[in-house]
Amino acid sequence: MLADLFERLFPRQQASRDTVKQRLKLVLAHDRADLSPELLQKMRQEILEVVSRYVELDSEGMELSLENDQRVTALVANLPIRRVKPATAEG
């Protein structure tokens, strides 16, 4: 009963465990994909620049990560869209 109370009052242990697990997955994916953190950051910036030409993004919810299974490493972008920008004439 007391343990349940502590678990409810201090649930961060599970969250921190999940955070560590996600960080480890990211490090492993970086190693397997041979992407440096600097290159990943540059890719992130360029992706955001291109997407921002067409839509307004919610910067708080943005997330870019590498996910890895046994065969494939995937770059996953979660980019919350606030609104689509009006079409502009490009030359």
Swiss-Prot record:
Keywords: Cell cycle, Cell division. Gene3D superfamilies: Cell division topological specificity factor MinE. InterPro entries: MinE, MinE_sf. The keyword Cell cycle applies. Disulfide bonds: none annotated. It comes from the Bacteria. Transmembrane segments: none annotated. The keyword Cell division applies. One of its GO terms (biological process) is cell division. Prevents the cell division inhibition by proteins MinC and MinD at internal division sites while permitting inhibition at polar sites. This ensures cell division at the proper site by restricting the formation of a division septum at the midpoint of the long axis of the cell. NCBIfam families: minE, PRK00296.1. HAMAP family: MinE. Belongs to the MinE family. This is Cell division topological specificity factor. The gene is minE.
